[in-house]
Amino acid sequence: MTTSAAGRPLIPQPPSTVTALRQAVAQVSPAALPAFTRELDEAADQARQGSDLAPLQRFIAQWAAYVHIQRQPQLAEDLRRWERVAATGTAEEAFKAASEIGKILDATHAALDAARR
């Protein structure tokens, strides 16, 4: 991942479309492209089987949040650090980490919701 000056996002938040999100993932986290493609295929299959767009909507929301975080190197590092603590820390540390991860995800979803308005 490349860095940006003064803590600015590496790229603007893309529109919440499959094409735009794929391009953004390729820029901010190319190693995640196989997971993106696999999860898109799974969501499309579920949508077809159930004649329901909800799986694709969940996919887009999930990856929009992923891009929102990954395009901000410090935020992405904070999330990775808290994920490590949650996986390897004591019960008390894991509880704190879960709280911090929740705050990051809540702020991410709030920012994405505000941008849609």
Regions found by a protein language model. Give the residues of each.
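Amphipathic alpha-helical interaction modules
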Residues: 32-75
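Intrinsic-disorder/low-complexity, polar/charged segments
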Residues: 17-21, 49, 72, 90-93
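Short terminal alpha-helical segments
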Residues: 2-45
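Amphipathic alpha-helical binding modules
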Residues: 77-117
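N-terminal pre-domain segments used for targeting or regulation
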Residues: 1-5, 114-117
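A structural signal for alpha-helix termini and helix-coil/disorder junctions
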Residues: 27, 42, 46, 69, ...
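Generic structural signal of hydrophobic/aromatic residues within well-ordered alpha-helices
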Residues: 21, 40, 56, 63, ...
